[in-house]
């Protein structure tokens, strides 16, 4: 009996430890935030009912906020992005151009998100009618149906490849429009979320964030190596989650394979140069040391080694 009791206790303890590891440990491998660049959404919807500013700017700002709140992305505010692009004589459209040097683009971000608003509005209809019954009348009920749709493209900044492209749309139906359309504005989050179109828009933004997370999950973060005498640095730091001890493969571009007719870059061949490890991490820069390999050069690529 004593043996059986001990055996049961051991088994129970083992189960508890496994459950605890699953619940609290999870996937605790270190990760790096992807740098997402959000372009202004082009508006091609018929929104004559809406008297506010361009909904494209409003939806782009909503997406920036949602990506930051997810904790998985580093996202530039629009003014900061414009300043960085100006310093490098680039535009947002250049980030999707494979004719622009990859290293120059990768100093700015990993993925570019571009959208075109195809639907942004609501319809109203009456359900039933007024039926007389003595002195009482049953009033018709109004039903509101909002629909918001976006043609979305997620583009790799490094390769200019379109990683995903499709339409994301949401429909919201209610017997209440929420608030007066005259008060509906992207600038007031409370009233925005009360309006039926605002609710549909919020759902679209949430789905866009999920899609970006899904598409970028297996992307390996790539940065640039900076060589200063005998010292080595990476052009990013604590703002994207780099920590001391993280290791990076160092690669050097050997050849671009281009289409003979269109000139489109089909593939880039890299040489493996070595491995570096983060020793000191600051905002915007990480000091690294060589783990293996020699002959590191300025502007070599560094690729995060997933554990």
Model-flagged regions — what are they?
Residues 40, 119, 156, 227, ...:
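A residue-level detector for short acidic-glycine micro-motifs
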Residues 249-307:
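Beta-strand/loop-dominated core regions that host nucleotide or nucleotide-derived cofactor-binding catalytic loops
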Residues 91-162, 243, 254-263, 267-269, ...:
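Surface-exposed short loop/turn segments
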Residues 21-95, 106, 114, 128, ...:
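A structural "domain/chain start" motif
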Residues 8-18:
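Bacterial N-terminal signal peptides
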Residues 32, 111, 148, 228, ...:
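Exposed loop/turn and edge beta-strand positions of beta-sandwich/beta-sheet ligand-binding modules
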Residues 1-4:
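N-terminal secretory signal peptides that target proteins for export/translocation
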